[in-house]
C-alpha cells in the first residue's frame, strides 16, 4: 500500500537512453514554461524528450528539440510541436550550469519530464559527459554481469 506522506509524482516522459549514452555528473530540477495546449498534451503522455538537449541563449536555459505533439481537441490556437521551451531556474543555477557546459565540455540532457505533487510541470536535467563506445560496452558488461549474478544466486538459494 502506498504511503500517504510520499509525494505523488506523475512521470510524463523519460529519457531512458541518457544513462547509457552519457556519464551523469549532477542532476537539477527545473520548471518548464508551457502553454495550455502543451500541458494537456504532456498530461496525455504523448511527449518525447529522447533526442532533446538544453542550451543557453541570452542568459537563459532553453530546452531544444523536445517533441510535444499538438493537442488533438484544440482548434486553431494549437502550439508548435518542436519549439524551444524556456526552463525556469534561479540565476545561480543558470550560472552554474552555463559554467559547467562552457569549461568542462559537459552537456545538459533532460532525464525526466513529470508533474510534481502540486501539478507543476518539472524537468529533471542532468549535467553529463558523452560516453565513448568502449565506455558503453563496459557499462553493458557490468549490467549483464549483475543480471547473471542475480540469476546464479536465485538458482542456488
Curated annotation (Swiss-Prot):
It comes from the Bacteria. Residues 135-151 have a biased composition (Basic and acidic residues). It is found in: Cytoplasm. One of its GO terms (molecular function) is RNA binding. Residues 133-157 are annotated as: Disordered. Keywords: Cytoplasm, RNA-binding. GO terms for biological process: trans-translation. One of its GO terms (cellular component) is cytosol. It holds the Pfam family SmpB. Belongs to the SmpB family. Required for rescue of stalled ribosomes mediated by trans-translation. Binds to transfer-messenger RNA (tmRNA), required for stable association of tmRNA with ribosomes. tmRNA and SmpB together mimic tRNA shape, replacing the anticodon stem-loop with SmpB. tmRNA is encoded by the ssrA gene; the 2 termini fold to resemble tRNA(Ala) and it encodes a 'tag peptide', a short internal open reading frame. During trans-translation Ala-aminoacylated tmRNA acts like a tRNA, entering the A-site of stalled ribosomes, displacing the stalled mRNA. This is SsrA-binding protein. It comes from Bradyrhizobium sp. (strain ORS 278).
